[in-house]
């Protein structure tokens, strides 16, 4: 019999309907795979085997009665940023020790309503702040990929590193993730998986622990483009509990898979050719252009002139919002409490002990740029830059461009504990150089695997689309996937 965990969501869905195996058998196969691998990969921080089996049994009953949902019996992993009722939800931070919410995030509720099964909570950078999944209170996630002939441990990217690693290693059929500055797309590129950050407002943010509220957006990480389309259809919804949720019908994204690219105009932004870009990334980008031309698309050069200001502007706006959002964690009602001589001392000690170094750094930067003497010089200026970045994209789309093809990462996955990156936060922040403009402009962005580098590690390409035109990204990404093939790591764990 086929290894059940090797099936895509689309394949598992059909075989479950045909009763080739039960949802319980599929769930047990994933739980066994997690037991065997999680010690080596550290992708999950909390497992829910009893809940998973109960959900799978209920799925089998619905399949038998002919009332199956769209994701009936499909086992998923959930990033630890999503509130899951009565289940560990800590944003992988010490400050939220023991927190189990009494409510469910809208995105996960949508998935359970369609029959999906929860396997557990996935590791991530603390409060989603990081590009390597090394800032988690639970330790780093290890990328299931290794360089040819090497045993060196590599990062899976961040902040959704647990989601990407679990999907790549077949420890779940798909996973929820979030993207504030590249946290879906960069880990997907590092692990040979597909990740989409939808348009801001497409998925509800209710029940997702906030990092930077004007940038955060939920999306799926999956094994292929079709699976990502299937997941996004269920994750997306209008939600009165999120004031930024957009009241637009959710298309059947899966129908976009396989559609022709004839008549589609793809833009190539010259500003993404940065100094020191590895030749392999440059070559892959050129190959992507050829694949899209071969598929019938027209490819044109475009300019996004304010791209070079995006990184500094992002690292003002995001920490500013984070410093405000994270002010609520004080040890009073839930999470870690460190006693002090008075309430102010208790606040200070709880926050100092509860937040990790990177989170503290961003809170301090955010507090600084919002302070009286610096608000106009930094925060206000960064918001003006953000408007200009958004306008760049609007101008390009107004000229008839349907989607943009760009690199997603400046390199393939790097080593866990890389000393150069660990000693210089700005070098780590540069990992986001190709991804943050999408968040600043609120646009949809998709990462699709496009090849392997000389070391045998996956590289991805990024597609950027018009607001709420995710279907264009799915059909374009599918054309790249057809040309490039799919990539699975050799099992060493």
Curated annotation (Swiss-Prot):
Substrates-to-products reaction catalysed: L-glutamyl-tRNA(Gln) + L-glutamine + ATP + H2O = L-glutaminyl-tRNA(Gln) + L-glutamate + ADP + phosphate + H(+)
Keyword Cell membrane attributed: no
EC class of the enzyme, as a word: ligase
Alphabetized GO MF terms: ATP binding; glutaminyl-tRNA synthase (glutamine-hydrolyzing) activity
A family per Pfam: Amidase
Organism in which the protein naturally occurs: Agrobacterium fabrum (strain C58 / ATCC 33970)
EC number(s) per entry: 6.3.5.7
Alphabetically ordered keywords of this record: ATP-binding, Ligase, Nucleotide-binding, Protein biosynthesis
GO CC annotations on file: glutamyl-tRNA(Gln) amidotransferase complex
Disulphide bridges, residue numbers: none
Function as written in the Swiss-Prot or TrEMBL entry: Allows the formation of correctly charged Gln-tRNA(Gln) through the transamidation of misacylated Glu-tRNA(Gln) in organisms which lack glutaminyl-tRNA synthetase. The reaction takes place in the presence of glutamine and ATP through an activated gamma-phospho-Glu-tRNA(Gln).
Protein encoded by which gene: gatA
Active-site residues, as the UniProt record annotates them: 79, 159, 183
Biological process per Gene Ontology, one example term: translation
HAMAP family: GatA
Family in the record: Belongs to the amidase family. GatA subfamily.
Protein name: Glutamyl-tRNA(Gln) amidotransferase subunit A
UniProt subunit comment: Heterotrimer of A, B and C subunits.
